[in-house]
């Protein structure tokens, strides 16, 4: 079946008139008129060629009509995939085999399979029925409709014409232009002719970029990389210092004169013990200063050479707070000898208390 296009039809033309005009050259299967053009389906290809030759520019109702083969593409696929082809088979031999079922537009052999483009869909169906699972040059070939989306339309399949760029001398798979229209990279071919291309510098573990951030590449994974212990400690100290400045900047500064000398020093011993000063006795103050200046590690820690200890009573010992201040105020009126003896007892109690450590 051949579909013919009829253009420039006059308004007076009818379907019956067009059908009777084309039936002079062959059997008409279908005739349709759409406004000022129409389509006629003729069963025989030879009859269609005769109708085109005789009716093109035929004057109908005073108007010259145009008759030519329809150029619309058939919705049915005409591309066939032929598998299991003999390695000695050529394009001409395979084309001649399929031309037994209809005109072949293109025939390409790729290794042990090939693609054949038939002119008509009905010829492609007949070729599948007649050639599938048949012997050809010692091999049973398989013929089926192609499911490939690449080059669904025939043309530009030989080495003489690339279907991507349109130039001659190379296959489409060797075309320097990719599917997006950009020129492909020929790094391997360049290396073979002019030497290897220098590869970009690759950083090692723990190294930084050899360019500044303003001119170098951005490291999007910098926050996830493992940093050294020194870098983490320095960052933590800096953040803690900044946090202290921000949160305590509104507090008034403490004068150094209001802080005791033994607390204002930067080398304060956290384990050092000091007695509360007694304002009623100068000897007690001197003894307390001497005891404070003495080192803890310079004491005689042998229990055999110690003097006899006098355990304090329940009410004696160290005290802090308001009660201890009241006891110190009342002790100001006591005898200095009693205060000295009490100090010696408290000093021994302090020594016995911390000697276990």
From Swiss-Prot:
Keywords noted in UniProt: Activator, Metal-binding, mRNA processing, mRNA splicing, Nucleus, Repeat, RNA-binding, Zinc, Zinc-finger
One MF annotation (Gene Ontology) recorded for this entry: RNA binding
Subunit structure: Interacts with TNPO3, which may mediate nuclear import of the protein.
Matches recorded under PROSITE patterns: RRM, ZF_CCHC
GO cellular component, one term: protein-containing complex
Gene3D superfamilies, per the entry: 3.30.70.330, Zinc finger, CCHC-type
Transmembrane segments: none
RRM domain segment(s): 2-72, 78-148
This protein's name: RNA-binding protein 4B
PANTHER family found in the cross-reference section: HETEROGENEOUS NUCLEAR RIBONUCLEOPROTEIN M-RELATED, OS02G0815200 PROTEIN
Residue spans, zinc finger CCHC-type: 160-177
Keyword Nucleotidyltransferase: no
Job description of the protein: Required for the translational activation of PER1 mRNA in response to circadian clock. Binds directly to the 3'-UTR of the PER1 mRNA.
CDD domains for the chain: RRM1_RBM4, RRM2_RBM4
Compartment annotation: Nucleus, Nucleolus
């Amino acid at each position: 079946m051949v579909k013919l296009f009829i253009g420039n039809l006059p308004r007076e033309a009818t379907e019956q008139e067009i059908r009777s005009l084309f039936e002079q050259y062959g059997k008409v299967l279908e005739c349709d008129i759409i406004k000022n053009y129409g389509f006629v389906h003729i069963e025989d290809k030879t009859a269609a060629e005769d109708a085109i030759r005789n009716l093109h520019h035929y004057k109908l109702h005073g108007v010259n009509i145009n008759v030519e083969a329809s150029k619309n593409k058939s919705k049915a696929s005409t591309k066939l995939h032929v598998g299991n082809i003999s390695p000695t088979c050529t394009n001409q031999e395979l084309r001649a085999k399929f031309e037994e079922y209809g005109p072949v537009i293109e025939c390409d052999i790729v290794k042990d399979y090939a693609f054949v483009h038939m002119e008509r869909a009905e010829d492609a169906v007949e070729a599948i029925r007649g050639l599938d699972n048949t012997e050809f040059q010692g091999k049973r070939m398989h013929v089926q409709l192609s499911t490939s989306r690449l080059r669904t339309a025939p043309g530009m399949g030989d080495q003489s014409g690339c279907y991507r760029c349109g130039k001659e001398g190379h296959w489409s798979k060797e075309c320097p232009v990719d599917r997006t229209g950009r020129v492909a990279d020929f790094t391997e071919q360049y290396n073979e002719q002019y030497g290897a291309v220098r590869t970009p510098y690759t950083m090692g573990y723990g190294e930084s970029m050899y360019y500044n951030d303003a001119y170098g590449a951005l490291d999007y994974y910098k926050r996830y990389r493992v940093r050294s212990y020194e870098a983490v400690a320095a960052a933590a100290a800096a953040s803690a210092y900044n946090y202290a400045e921000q949160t305590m900047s509104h507090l008034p500064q403490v004068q150094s004169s209001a802080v005791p000398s033994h607390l204002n020093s930067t080398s304060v011993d956290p384990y050092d013990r000091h007695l509360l000063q007694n304002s009623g006795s100068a000897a007690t103050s001197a003894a307390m200063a001497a005891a404070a200046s003495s080192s803890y590690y310079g004491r005689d820690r042998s229990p055999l050479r110690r003097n006899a200890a006098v355990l304090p009573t329940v009410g004696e010992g160290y005290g802090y707070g308001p009660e201890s201040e009241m006891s110190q105020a009342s002790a100001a009126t006591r005898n200095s000898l009693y205060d000295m003896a009490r100090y010696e007892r408290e000093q021994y109690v302090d020594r016995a208390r911390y000697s276990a450590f």
